[in-house]
Amino acid sequence: MQKSALAIALASLLTPISYLHANEAQPQETVVVTANRFEQKASSTLADVEIITRQDIEQTQAKTLPELLRRLTGVQITQNGGRGQLASLFVRGTSSDQVLVLVDGIRFARAAKGAVDFNQIPLTYVDRIEYVRGARASLYGSEAIGGVINIITKARSQQQGTTVSAGLGSLDYQELSIASGVAIGEKGQMNVALGTESDKGYNVRPVPGVNDGDRHGFRSDNALLGYVHQFDESWSLFANARAYENIYQYDNSYGTRDYKEAEKDDLSFTIGTQYQSERWVSELQLTTQKQKSWDYTQSKGKYSDTSDNLEQRNIQWINRYLVNDVWTFAGGVDWRDESYIDKTADKEFDRSNTAAFAVVAAEWQQWLLEASLRFDDNQEYGSQTTHNIALGYQFIPEFGVKASYGSAFKAPNLYQQYDPSYGNVNLQPEDADSAELSFYGLFSGIKWSITGYDYKINNLIDYNSTTKNYQNVIGESNIKGVEFTAEFATGIVQHQLSVDLKDADDSKGKTLQRRAEHMYKWNALVAFEQVDWSIGYQYVGKRPDLDYNTYPTQNITLDAYSLVDTSVSYYVTDSTTISARIDNLLDKEYETANGYPAAERAYYLNIGYQF
């Protein structure tokens, strides 16, 4: 297929976050699957996509998913303390429950009482992460207002070999993992990943005179098993299972020393098949996911207090047809059923959602076009229709423009709808409109882009202290901002810069809680002979927050902070690597949530062996 001038220019801009690894040859084209729900060259999509590869995870020596995601453009992490504690994010000022999280292309079940807790997803079985900024509800449905994060596991990897990794670090941190890909006969591939990690933590919620000396630790055990069978060049079958058991500790209240533990268990199974010909690709997947959450006082034990169960079942059928060198059509059907069991109230709630979507993409000379439409039918809140259209034009080989406009929505979660005390079955989805305009180019070896975005969100769902339940807030919240990104090299150093400036206001014109108006990030990699040196810097400006330990609750402002992390990997041989990482290199004192100090400077050492 002959590529347009615009596609060639976009290909140079849509490089993975892997810093154009100076010590290895690059693939001819970066391929993405999340932008339009089918595999395509990055140069053929108008979406803003960033990619984290497994090599990036190894080079940065990140220990948690939030440590990786905070390097991405427009991402701001909020965390209630250290490893394992509740972690959420904002993308372009939209909240965690307005960002869709996928695992292998399937919606990850959200905790019944809120959004995805990013600290609970282990890195052991992560192979790649694709991050799409901007509304994508016309493809995926609910939650895809601010963007989509697709965590792609090793379940369908074709890479063979075994890697063993062991490490230790500050706060009595220990980790051990093994990942292996093995050929089964001539047409099969088995993938296995096992991991365990723990630390004793620190006092994530210090209250002088009440819990002095407390340490709030974390432990995670996780596993993945995947199998792929290629019957012939066109037809394949795949199946996988993944699980984790995470336990973390915290204090029950501000005024009493009531030590508590929370346990989060997750188990999922997937089976699917794919047919692929020269022009047509069709894939069918069936997935079931079960989550169990316990919250109990340590002295009384696991079954003394509350527990919640959440089950989610998905069927997904996606098709893509390449009409000719210009036009591509895609579409599919999604079905999801969710069950929430509240053990405290001894009640079970269930709802289902059926959806169909269609996409058309065109690539002709200096033009790129994308248009998508989706219809969702939910048994509780009715139907939603969302759309998106994007257009790009290349003026000259080194300069282009693209624009998009779309609609999106976020459905109430199961807790907000069904909780016996605080739920409201009459809640309606939040709805949003988004518009973006982007200029990009290549100048003197610098790849750059500047994007303006504007989100208008209505019917925000929030707790109402007067009615004592969740209600839709009347009025319109507005988030508008500008992003600037740049990639360039100075000698053997590869640089990535991003600037995010935004105003995120509620319907009364007040800044939305915990959103920073200014963020600056710099990521760099030095790859020289047998050594990789990675460094990451971020500045997060002042943010409004609430002090829940006062009555009535007081408005406060969290201080701005700068954070530096660095890591070094030394390749002793082709099979042995020794790595070290320092978190919070400058030992800054800061909070991303009021009353929850972040960890002090921490050191980590790791050794990996491949065979």
Curated annotation (Swiss-Prot):
Domain of life: Bacteria
Membrane topology: Multi-pass membrane protein
Spans through the membrane: none
Family in the record: Belongs to the TonB-dependent receptor family. BtuB (TC 1.B.14.3.1) subfamily.
GO biological process: cobalamin transport; monoatomic ion transport
Record's subcellular location: Cell outer membrane
Function summary: Involved in the active translocation of vitamin B12 (cyanocobalamin) across the outer membrane to the periplasmic space. It derives its energy for transport by interacting with the trans-periplasmic membrane protein TonB.
Motif (TonB box): 29-36
Listed name of the protein: Vitamin B12 transporter BtuB
PROSITE patterns reported for this sequence: TONB_DEPENDENT_REC_1 (PS00430), TONB_DEPENDENT_REC_2 (PS01156), TONB_DEPENDENT_REC_3 (PS52016)
NCBIfam families: TonB-B12
Species per Swiss-Prot/TrEMBL record: Vibrio cholerae serotype O1 (strain ATCC 39315 / El Tor Inaba N16961)
Annotated PANTHER family: COLICIN I RECEPTOR-RELATED (PTHR30069:SF53), TONB-DEPENDENT OUTER MEMBRANE RECEPTOR (PTHR30069)
Keyword Glycosyltransferase listed: no
Key words, A-Z: Cell outer membrane, Ion transport, Membrane, Porin, Signal, TonB box, Transmembrane, Transmembrane beta strand, Transport
Record-annotated TBDR beta-barrel domain positions: 159-611
Listed Gene3D superfamilies: TonB-dependent receptor, beta-barrel domain (2.40.170.20), TonB-dependent receptor, plug domain (2.170.130.10)
Motif TonB C-terminal box positions after renumbering to this chain: 594-611
